[in-house]
Curated annotation (Swiss-Prot):
This is DNA-directed RNA polymerase subunit omega. It comes from Bifidobacterium animalis subsp. lactis (strain AD011). One of its GO terms (molecular function) is DNA-directed RNA polymerase activity. Keywords: DNA-directed RNA polymerase, Nucleotidyltransferase, Transcription, Transferase. It catalyses: RNA(n) + a ribonucleoside 5'-triphosphate = RNA(n+1) + diphosphate. It is an enzyme of class 2 (transferase). It comes from the Bacteria. It holds the Pfam family RNA_pol_Rpb6.
Amino acid sequence: MAFGTEPIPTGLADPPIDDLMEHADSKYALAIFAAKRARQINSYFTQLNEGLLQNVGPLVEYKSQEKPLSIAFREINEGLLEETLGEDDLSEGN
């Protein structure tokens, strides 16, 4: 059993926010992008329990207790998703 600190410390966000920002125009766009994907992943897990499969599941390996938002961040970081703005996104806040 090892004690002490990790050689490469991990922060609260893994992958780091700086890496994720390479895939979005702004931190706000990243938050919306990740939240929408996390909702899709959450719906997938709910539908899986009900025997329905209408959403696409996680595109990366995940742990059983991992949060949908963490999975979405890893998908974004690995370049598995592409951010596109729809009409609803363009009209929000205007």
